[in-house]
Design a protein with these regions (language model features):
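Short beta-strand segments in beta-sandwich/barrel cores
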Residues: 2, 21, 181
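A generic structural motif
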Residues: 5, 97-99, 192
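Long terminal accessory segments
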Residues: 171-193
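Short, small-residue-biased leader/transition segments that mark boundaries at the very start
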Residues: 1-8
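Basic, glycine/proline-rich low-complexity segments that contact nucleic acids
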Residues: 12-166, 175
Protein backbone atom coordinates (compact mmCIF):
# COMPACT_ATOMS: atom_id res chain seq x y z
CA UNK A 1 0.00 0.00 0.00
CA UNK A 2 1.40 3.39 -1.00
CA UNK A 3 1.61 5.69 2.02
CA UNK A 4 3.12 9.08 1.14
CA UNK A 5 6.21 10.81 -0.22
CA UNK A 6 9.10 12.32 1.71
CA UNK A 7 12.73 13.40 1.27
CA UNK A 8 15.86 11.70 2.57
CA UNK A 9 19.01 13.80 2.05
CA UNK A 10 17.49 15.75 -0.87
CA UNK A 11 16.31 12.54 -2.56
CA UNK A 12 12.56 12.12 -3.18
CA UNK A 13 11.35 8.87 -1.60
CA UNK A 14 8.05 7.03 -1.26
CA UNK A 15 6.91 5.12 1.82
CA UNK A 16 5.28 1.75 1.07
CA UNK A 17 3.57 -0.65 3.45
CA UNK A 18 4.31 -4.10 2.06
CA UNK A 19 2.95 -6.59 4.50
CA UNK A 20 2.25 -8.77 6.22
CA UNK A 21 0.93 -10.75 3.25
CA UNK A 22 -0.59 -14.20 3.68
CA UNK A 23 -0.19 -17.04 1.18
CA UNK A 24 -3.81 -17.87 0.36
CA UNK A 25 -3.21 -20.31 -2.51
CA UNK A 26 -0.31 -22.26 -4.02
CA UNK A 27 -0.74 -23.26 -7.66
CA UNK A 28 1.32 -26.13 -9.06
CA UNK A 29 2.22 -27.32 -12.57
CA UNK A 30 0.40 -30.67 -12.34
CA UNK A 31 -2.81 -29.27 -10.86
CA UNK A 32 -3.14 -25.82 -12.46
CA UNK A 33 -0.78 -25.96 -15.45
CA UNK A 34 1.62 -23.38 -13.99
CA UNK A 35 3.19 -22.61 -10.64
CA UNK A 36 2.49 -19.46 -8.64
CA UNK A 37 1.67 -18.09 -5.20
CA UNK A 38 -1.44 -16.08 -4.40
CA UNK A 39 -0.89 -13.48 -1.70
CA UNK A 40 -3.59 -11.72 0.30
CA UNK A 41 -3.17 -8.30 1.89
CA UNK A 42 -5.23 -5.91 4.05
CA UNK A 43 -7.75 -7.68 6.28
CA UNK A 44 -11.37 -7.25 5.20
CA UNK A 45 -13.90 -6.93 8.01
CA UNK A 46 -17.27 -7.29 6.26
CA UNK A 47 -19.11 -7.91 2.97
CA UNK A 48 -17.15 -11.02 2.00
CA UNK A 49 -18.95 -13.46 -0.29
CA UNK A 50 -19.38 -17.11 0.71
CA UNK A 51 -17.10 -18.32 -2.08
CA UNK A 52 -14.26 -16.08 -0.87
CA UNK A 53 -14.88 -17.10 2.74
CA UNK A 54 -14.37 -20.73 1.71
CA UNK A 55 -11.27 -19.79 -0.26
CA UNK A 56 -9.67 -18.10 2.76
CA UNK A 57 -10.75 -20.89 5.12
CA UNK A 58 -8.53 -23.34 3.20
CA UNK A 59 -5.45 -21.30 4.09
CA UNK A 60 -6.72 -20.71 7.66
CA UNK A 61 -6.39 -16.95 7.15
CA UNK A 62 -8.72 -14.01 7.65
CA UNK A 63 -10.55 -12.56 4.67
CA UNK A 64 -8.43 -10.14 2.65
CA UNK A 65 -9.19 -7.06 0.57
CA UNK A 66 -6.51 -7.56 -2.09
CA UNK A 67 -5.38 -10.76 -3.79
CA UNK A 68 -2.37 -10.81 -6.12
CA UNK A 69 -0.75 -13.76 -7.89
CA UNK A 70 3.04 -14.00 -8.30
CA UNK A 71 4.63 -16.41 -10.78
CA UNK A 72 8.12 -17.78 -10.28
CA UNK A 73 8.13 -17.12 -6.55
CA UNK A 74 11.28 -18.57 -4.97
CA UNK A 75 11.24 -19.99 -1.48
CA UNK A 76 9.97 -22.90 0.56
CA UNK A 77 6.60 -21.59 1.75
CA UNK A 78 3.42 -23.33 2.86
CA UNK A 79 -0.25 -22.33 2.70
CA UNK A 80 -1.05 -19.72 5.35
CA UNK A 81 2.56 -18.52 5.78
CA UNK A 82 3.15 -14.80 6.25
CA UNK A 83 5.49 -12.85 3.99
CA UNK A 84 6.82 -9.65 5.52
CA UNK A 85 9.05 -6.78 4.46
CA UNK A 86 12.11 -8.86 5.46
CA UNK A 87 11.84 -10.38 1.97
CA UNK A 88 13.57 -7.18 0.72
CA UNK A 89 17.11 -5.92 1.37
CA UNK A 90 18.39 -2.35 1.52
CA UNK A 91 20.24 -1.33 -1.64
CA UNK A 92 18.48 -3.71 -4.04
CA UNK A 93 16.24 -2.57 -6.89
CA UNK A 94 12.51 -3.33 -7.13
CA UNK A 95 9.72 -2.82 -9.67
CA UNK A 96 6.53 -1.18 -8.38
CA UNK A 97 3.23 -1.22 -10.27
CA UNK A 98 0.02 0.57 -9.36
CA UNK A 99 -3.01 2.45 -10.70
CA UNK A 100 -2.26 6.09 -11.49
CA UNK A 101 -4.42 8.95 -10.25
CA UNK A 102 -7.48 9.42 -12.47
CA UNK A 103 -7.86 12.85 -14.08
CA UNK A 104 -11.15 12.27 -15.90
CA UNK A 105 -11.84 13.27 -19.52
CA UNK A 106 -9.08 15.69 -20.56
CA UNK A 107 -8.13 17.54 -23.72
CA UNK A 108 -5.01 17.03 -25.79
CA UNK A 109 -3.02 19.82 -24.09
CA UNK A 110 -3.24 18.20 -20.64
CA UNK A 111 -3.38 14.59 -21.84
CA UNK A 112 -0.61 14.58 -24.47
CA UNK A 113 1.18 17.89 -23.94
CA UNK A 114 0.07 19.51 -27.22
CA UNK A 115 0.98 23.19 -27.57
CA UNK A 116 -2.42 24.23 -28.89
CA UNK A 117 -2.85 26.30 -32.04
CA UNK A 118 -0.95 29.23 -30.55
CA UNK A 119 -1.44 32.94 -31.14
CA UNK A 120 -5.01 34.10 -31.34
CA UNK A 121 -4.13 36.22 -34.39
CA UNK A 122 -5.24 36.00 -38.02
CA UNK A 123 -8.87 35.88 -37.01
CA UNK A 124 -8.65 32.68 -34.92
CA UNK A 125 -11.02 32.16 -32.04
CA UNK A 126 -11.84 29.21 -29.75
CA UNK A 127 -8.83 27.26 -31.10
CA UNK A 128 -6.26 27.86 -28.35
CA UNK A 129 -6.31 24.28 -26.98
CA UNK A 130 -7.55 22.49 -30.10
CA UNK A 131 -5.68 19.44 -31.47
CA UNK A 132 -5.50 20.69 -35.06
CA UNK A 133 -5.68 18.31 -38.02
CA UNK A 134 -6.30 14.61 -37.42
CA UNK A 135 -5.44 13.51 -40.95
CA UNK A 136 -6.13 13.97 -44.65
CA UNK A 137 -9.59 13.96 -46.21
CA UNK A 138 -10.95 11.59 -48.81
CA UNK A 139 -7.72 9.69 -49.53
CA UNK A 140 -7.56 7.58 -46.38
CA UNK A 141 -11.24 8.31 -45.64
CA UNK A 142 -10.61 7.38 -42.05
CA UNK A 143 -8.66 8.40 -38.96
CA UNK A 144 -5.58 6.27 -38.36
CA UNK A 145 -5.47 4.13 -35.23
CA UNK A 146 -3.51 5.53 -32.33
CA UNK A 147 -4.24 9.17 -33.20
CA UNK A 148 -3.71 11.19 -30.03
CA UNK A 149 -6.98 12.82 -29.05
CA UNK A 150 -8.89 13.94 -25.98
CA UNK A 151 -10.10 11.22 -23.61
CA UNK A 152 -9.84 9.51 -20.23
CA UNK A 153 -6.57 10.47 -18.55
CA UNK A 154 -4.91 8.52 -15.76
CA UNK A 155 -6.54 5.62 -13.88
CA UNK A 156 -4.34 3.15 -15.77
CA UNK A 157 -1.88 0.51 -14.59
CA UNK A 158 1.73 1.70 -14.67
CA UNK A 159 4.92 -0.10 -13.66
CA UNK A 160 7.97 1.86 -12.50
CA UNK A 161 11.19 -0.11 -12.91
CA UNK A 162 14.38 -0.17 -10.84
CA UNK A 163 13.50 1.82 -7.74
CA UNK A 164 16.26 1.57 -5.14
CA UNK A 165 15.30 0.34 -1.67
CA UNK A 166 16.58 3.02 0.71
CA UNK A 167 15.34 1.63 4.03
CA UNK A 168 13.57 -1.47 5.37
CA UNK A 169 11.66 -1.03 8.65
CA UNK A 170 10.81 -4.56 9.80
CA UNK A 171 8.78 -3.68 12.89
CA UNK A 172 6.22 -1.65 10.86
CA UNK A 173 6.49 -3.57 7.53
CA UNK A 174 7.54 -0.30 5.87
CA UNK A 175 9.67 -0.13 2.71
CA UNK A 176 11.12 3.22 1.61
CA UNK A 177 12.10 3.44 -2.07
CA UNK A 178 13.87 6.22 -3.93
CA UNK A 179 11.63 7.94 -6.49
CA UNK A 180 7.92 8.22 -7.12
CA UNK A 181 5.31 5.47 -7.22
CA UNK A 182 2.04 5.66 -9.20
CA UNK A 183 -1.25 6.13 -7.35
CA UNK A 184 -2.78 8.17 -4.60
CA UNK A 185 -2.08 7.77 -0.89
CA UNK A 186 -3.33 4.42 0.51
CA UNK A 187 -3.71 2.94 -2.98
CA UNK A 188 -2.72 -0.71 -3.55
CA UNK A 189 0.61 -1.38 -5.25
CA UNK A 190 2.59 -4.48 -6.22
CA UNK A 191 6.31 -4.70 -5.43
CA UNK A 192 8.49 -7.22 -7.28
CA UNK A 193 12.20 -7.98 -7.00
Amino acid sequence: RRQRQMCIRDSPCTILQVGPCTITQIKTDDKDGYSSFQLGFDEKIKNTTKSYEGHFKKSKSKTMNKLVEFKGFNGDYKLGDKITVDHFVEGEFVDVSGITKGKGFQGVVKRHGFAGVGDSTHGQHNRMRAPGSIGAGSDPSRVFKGMRMAGQTGNSKVKVLNLKVVKVMSEDNILIVKGSVPGHNNSYITVRK
